[in-house]
C-alpha cells in the first residue's frame, strides 16, 4: 500500500509520501516474486524559478513500464520549457498529459492494476491560499481541484 497526502491549510500546503515501492513479477506457470524498495522518491519538485511554487506527490502504481514517476521528471521539465509562471491548474494539466502519454506508450493495453495518482499542490500568483489538484493516470486524467476556495481547507489522500 502506498501513501500520498496533501493538506491545504490557511498557512500553507503540506505534501507528504511514504518511500516504499513494491514490484512484482511472475513467469507463466511459476511463482510470483515480490520485491520491496524503501528508498523511492515520491515527493516531486521541479526546477526553474517559475515552477518552484508547485510540488507533487505520487502514489498507486509504482512504475510506468520500468520507470518511476521521479525518473521522468527531467523529461517533463524539458517539455515545460522556460517562460511564465504557470497556474497550478495549467501545471496539473501538463503533468497529467505528460504522464498519460508515457502510460499509453509503455503500459500493456490489458493492464488491470491500480493507476498512478498525483496530488499537485502550489500557489498561483497573487492568491492568498494554495490550490490542490488530483490526477489519476490513466483513469481520470482531468485535474480535479480539492478543497476549492479561500475558506475550504482540508486533507486529500
Describe the predicted segments one by one.
Residues 1-157:
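N-terminal nucleophile
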Amino acid at each position: 500500500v502506498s501513501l500520498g497526502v496533501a493538506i491545504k491549510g490557511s498557512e500553507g500546503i503540506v505534501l507528504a509520501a511514504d518511500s516504499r515501492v513494491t514490484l512484482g513479477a511472475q513467469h507463466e506457470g511459476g511463482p510470483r516474486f515480490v520485491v520491496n524498495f524503501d528508498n523511492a522518491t515520491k515527493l516531486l519538485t521541479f526546477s526553474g524559478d517559475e515552477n518552484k511554487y508547485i510540488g507533487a506527490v505520487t502514489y498507486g502504481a509504482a512504475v510506468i513500464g520500468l520507470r518511476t514517476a521521479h525518473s521522468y521528471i527531467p523529461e517533463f521539465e524539458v517539455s515545460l520549457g522556460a517562460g511564465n509562471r504557470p497556474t497550478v491548474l495549467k501545471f496539473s494539466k501538463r503533468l497529467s498529459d505528460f504522464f498519460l502519454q508515457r502510460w499509453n506508450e509503455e503500459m500493456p493495453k490489458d493492464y488491470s492494476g491500480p493507476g498512478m495518482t498525483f496530488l499537485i499542490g502550489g500557489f498561483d500568483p497573487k492568491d492568498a491560499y494554495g490550490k490542490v489538484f488530483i490526477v489519476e493516470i490513466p483513469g481520470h486524467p482531468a485535474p480535479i481541484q480539492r478543497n476549492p476556495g479561500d475558506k475550504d481547507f482540508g486533507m486529500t489522500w
